[in-house]
Amino acid sequence: MGFSSIWHWIIVLVVVLLLFGAGKIPRLMGDVAKGVKAFKKGMADDEDDEAASVSAERRGIEDGKPAQTIYPPQQPQQPQQPPQQPPVHRDDAPRG
């Protein structure tokens, strides 16, 4: 036997009414509803903030200042030297 019987639900309802009283249940439900509304509002605010930051990044503006483009450091170019020829050895010894 599970909680599918109507008698189980009636007994649970009576116990809840005895524990909390008839006046406390509507206040409890009102507090739950306020909590749900605050949660939804917070989620909507987060989505708006995220959308605003994404659109600011697309425009290249963050906090009202233009974004700076950062380039990778460039290595100084060294002038190209012509390839060196191997030294010429002359024999000072007489031939012949």
UniProtKB/Swiss-Prot annotation:
It is a single-pass membrane protein. GO terms for molecular function: protein transmembrane transporter activity. The chain crosses the membrane at residues 1-21. Residues 42-96 are annotated as: Disordered. GO terms for biological process: protein transport by the Tat complex. Part of the twin-arginine translocation (Tat) system that transports large folded proteins containing a characteristic twin-arginine motif in their signal peptide across membranes. TatA could form the protein-conducting channel of the Tat system. The Tat system comprises two distinct complexes: a TatABC complex, containing multiple copies of TatA, TatB and TatC subunits, and a separate TatA complex, containing only TatA subunits. Substrates initially bind to the TatABC complex, which probably triggers association of the separate TatA complex to form the active translocon. This is Sec-independent protein translocase protein TatA. It comes from Rhodospirillum rubrum (strain ATCC 11170 / ATH 1.1.1 / DSM 467 / LMG 4362 / NCIMB 8255 / S1).
